């Protein structure tokens, strides 16, 4: 239905767009539990490593990191140090799972040059609210 209602794309080359399923922790507030969770869950490296492992085991190509991945919502250039984002990006790459970052529209408006930075980091996409 969307294809029938949408106007023709103005993009001549959209081969760079890689759609796919994503695992998103916002639904349960990154609160993991169960017999295989032997760490404190939250906005930290171990939690997102767990999500990457989950996504990899079920062939989900992306995870979304929601609010909390950055030190502050309005400074999207400085990751939360507990996330160890460069390590997670590499871990995801090794497991064929890309990382999508959540952003506030205000942060994007005030830091429009960040998309090149994210590309350099290896981020696969953004989710903007």
Tell me what each language-model feature is:
Residues 67-129:
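Aromatic- and carboxylate-enriched substrate-binding clefts and catalytic-loop regions
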């Amino acid at each position: 239905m969307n294809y029938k209602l949408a106007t023709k794309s103005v993009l001549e080359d959209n081969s760079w767009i890689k759609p796919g399923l994503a695992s998103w922790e916002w639904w349960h507030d990154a609160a993991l539990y169960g017999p295989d969770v032997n760490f404190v869950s939250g906005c930290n490296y171990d939690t997102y490593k767990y999500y990457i492992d989950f996504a990899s085991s079920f062939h989900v190509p992306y995870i979304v990191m929601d609010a909390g991945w950055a030190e502050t919502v309005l400074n999207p250039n400085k990751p939360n140090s507990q996330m160890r984002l460069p390590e997670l990006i590499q871990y995801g790459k090794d497991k064929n799972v890309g990382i999508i970052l959540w952003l506030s529209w205000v942060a994007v408006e005030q830091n429009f040059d960040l998309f090149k930075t994210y590309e350099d980091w290896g981020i696969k996409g953004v989710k903007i609210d």
